[in-house]
């Protein structure tokens, strides 16, 4: 009787070892987990080491406008000839962030998603658009930059700076919940709205044009040095709850 029990134990252990070896198999092997958390190509695993940085570039033809929605990471917009060009750089640890893009109604829509509680996790976008392309960007956490854009711009982040440089847009909106907002124009704009919840706001326009300026700060200095005319059809609204507000020529 004792010898039978010993044999039974040996058989049970052998069976357990077989199951473990199956679970350790590669893709498609018995026991492989195809529905579990995403594993970074850098060799990370849930709760494990950093997956690294993964850049990816592509071009999109036929789009006439750009709309970017990014949960965590920076967005930089530049201007150039040819079709729209996108470079996504992913930085992640145990879980790789998801990205997707599609052209819908003539608008290229880019979406960068998060990784739950896994860190690090961000998607940095660099997008080159043709001249006169309207641009909309929304970021939860990260910097937003637009350089030389001549189409309308609507840029916003919950946390981070927003910078527009050498803008040729007639209409521009730049917003940050927590961070500086800077807008510099190469040509006189028709309407500018620059807003920060916590941070400095600076708007710089070419000399020689008068504006209806509405500048306000909750806590901080207010400095307006552009020609002002309340009846002007050109309007600049610059506000912050905490920080300095400057509207100037340059």
Model-identified regions with their sequence ranges:
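Short linear S-[DN]-x-LW-Φ motif typified by the pepsin-like aspartic protease active-site region
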Residues: 3-6, 10, 23-104, 128, ...
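C-terminal motif of bacterial Sec signal peptides marking the signal peptidase cleavage site
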Residues: 18-21
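Short, T/G/N/S-enriched strand-turn elements that build extracellular solenoid repeat scaffolds
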Residues: 55-57, 74-79, 98-100, 124-128, ...
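Structural recognition of beta-strand segments within beta-rich domains
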Residues: 69-70, 118-121, 127-129, 136-138, ...
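Secondary-structure transition/turn motif
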Residues: 89-93, 111-118
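Right-handed parallel beta-helix
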Residues: 136-175
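Short, surface-exposed interaction patches in beta-rich subdomains
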Residues: 165-250
